[in-house]
Amino acid sequence: MKALEWMGDSLKILDQTRLPVEIKYRMAATYEEVAEAIEKMEVRGAPAIGAAAAYGYALGAIGYSGELAGLSAHMEKVQHRLAETRPTAVNLFWALRRMEDRLRDQHEAKELAEIRQALVAEAESIAEDDRRVNRLIGEHGNAIVTAEANILTHCNAGALATVEYGTALGVIRAAQQAGKKVHVYAGETRPFLQGARLTALELMNDHIPVTLIADNMAGFLMQQGNIDLVIVGADRIAANGDTANKIGTYSLAVLAHAHGIPFYVAAPTSTIDLKVPSGQDIPIEERNPKELREVFGVQVAPPEVPVYNPAFDVTPAKLITGIITEKGIVTSPYSVNLLKMMVRS
């Protein structure tokens, strides 16, 4: 299963809200349809969101039928619409900046067709970069996995969260392919259940041993000595190493620290935002209260009960053992070493 696939004039998006019960695709032919798919979490995961937004930007140009002189204003509207879909995942904004830069490079173009072709090529380049980067993350991350390891992960940072292969799950895949005996504990990840619905499905499809657990079981597993390593993905990493990821990640980091268990973040360098000094400056998306009051349309709480439903939390850098990127593994002091790595790249 691929999270998304370019079809030449539309974007084929796997509707992940229906997994694992049903495999259904959306054929997005306009940038608005891509934006809706991102908002509804039909496509999710920071790298996949970035790639989807890039294709959405290209579709904005493909769908434009006005004069060449008016394209720039139209594309500003397209970019704004896509940028407002998910505020926390920095890959979204990184991809849109790349697309905007490619559009500016076409200032001497005489035909709309030439510009459209260039934008599609840039979107495909972003997608291909993600495929390559995820393999490198897996290769570097394999070094931290012992010959036999029980690994805890949270949410879904696999192929379904990227264009291909995955970040946190990419490390696990690489370890398995290297002949290591890995067993994964996947937290269910309330309220959207990405761990239960997506991570468990991915790992089972790849014949990687996996056990699904309730989110509130993680501490007990660690206490029993059943966890050797925690690996999670990321939606935005601040300049000091503070990391925004799916709600519940911070709790796992605190538990891992208390039990002396290594806690790693796996993410591409496009997830690192050096313009954000610390986690306090990362915008945190709040989702619809219905996601907590209901489970798949079934009411599980009083309909009027107040709800606080942030989609992400921030794990302080001091709780992170290392950040696995395509450039290698970065360790503390992050404010120094992240900058060094980004300058080199």
Swiss-Prot record:
Gene3D superfamilies registered for this protein in UniProt: translation initiation factor eif-2b, domain 1, Translation initiation factor eif-2b, domain 2
Binding site for substrate: R44, G45, A46, R86, Q194, N245, K246
Full protein name: Methylthioribose-1-phosphate isomerase
Keywords attached to this entry: Amino-acid biosynthesis, Isomerase, Methionine biosynthesis
Residues under site feature: Transition state stabilizer: C155
Record carries keyword Isomerase: yes
Gene Ontology MF terms in the entry: S-methyl-5-thioribose-1-phosphate isomerase activity
Higher taxonomy: Bacteria, Bacillati, Bacillota, Clostridia, Eubacteriales
Keyword NADP applies: no
InterPro entries in UniProt: IF-2B-related, IF-M1Pi, IF_2B-like_C, Initiation_fac_2B_a/b/d, M1Pi_N, NagB/RpiA_transferase-like
Enzyme class: isomerase
GO biological process: L-methionine salvage from methylthioadenosine
Annotated family: Belongs to the eIF-2B alpha/beta/delta subunits family. MtnA subfamily.
Role description: Catalyzes the interconversion of methylthioribose-1-phosphate (MTR-1-P) into methylthioribulose-1-phosphate (MTRu-1-P).
Species, as recorded: Desulfitobacterium hafniense (strain Y51)
Catalytic site positions: D235 (proton donor)
Pathways involved: Amino-acid biosynthesis; L-methionine biosynthesis via salvage pathway; L-methionine from S-methyl-5-thio-alpha-D-ribose 1-phosphate: step 1/6
Catalytic activity: 5-(methylsulfanyl)-alpha-D-ribose 1-phosphate = 5-(methylsulfanyl)-D-ribulose 1-phosphate
Gene that this polypeptide is encoded by: mtnA
The enzyme's E.C. designation: 5.3.1.23
